[in-house]
């Protein structure tokens, strides 16, 4: 059972972290969101009470 052998764990975790931080992260950071947030004022709608026909 190779998962019980803890010898390569540190190396695998370090290589995973380096791969993410040096290769994947710079490729993901330049993307801009499709719908950027805008400064909209919240609109309040007037609610009317429900009519209860059985009272």
Swiss-Prot record:
GO terms, biological process: proton motive force-driven ATP synthesis
Function as written in the Swiss-Prot or TrEMBL entry: Mitochondrial membrane ATP synthase (F(1)F(0) ATP synthase or Complex V) produces ATP from ADP in the presence of a proton gradient across the membrane which is generated by electron transport complexes of the respiratory chain. F-type ATPases consist of two structural domains, F(1) - containing the extramembraneous catalytic core and F(0) - containing the membrane proton channel, linked together by a central stalk and a peripheral stalk. During catalysis, ATP synthesis in the catalytic domain of F(1) is coupled via a rotary mechanism of the central stalk subunits to proton translocation.
UniProt superkingdom: Eukaryota
Primary location class: mitochondrion
The name this protein goes by in its record: ATP synthase protein 8
Bias (Low complexity) ranges: 37-55
PANTHER family: ATP SYNTHASE PROTEIN 8
Gene: MT-ATP8
Family: Belongs to the ATPase protein 8 family.
Keywords: ATP synthesis, CF(0), Hydrogen ion transport, Ion transport, Membrane, Mitochondrion, Transmembrane, Transmembrane helix, Transport
Molecular function in Gene Ontology: proton transmembrane transporter activity
Topology within the bilayer: Single-pass membrane protein
Native organism: Corythaeola cristata
Region (Disordered): 35-55
Record localization: Mitochondrion membrane
SS bond partners: none
């Amino acid at each position: 059972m190779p998962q019980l052998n803890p010898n390569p764990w540190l190396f695998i975790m370090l290589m995973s972290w380096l791969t993410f931080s040096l290769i994947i992260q710079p490729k993901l950071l330049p993307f801009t969101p499709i719908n950027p947030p805008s400064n909209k004022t919240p609109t309040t709608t007037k609610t009317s009470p429900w009519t209860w026909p059985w009272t």
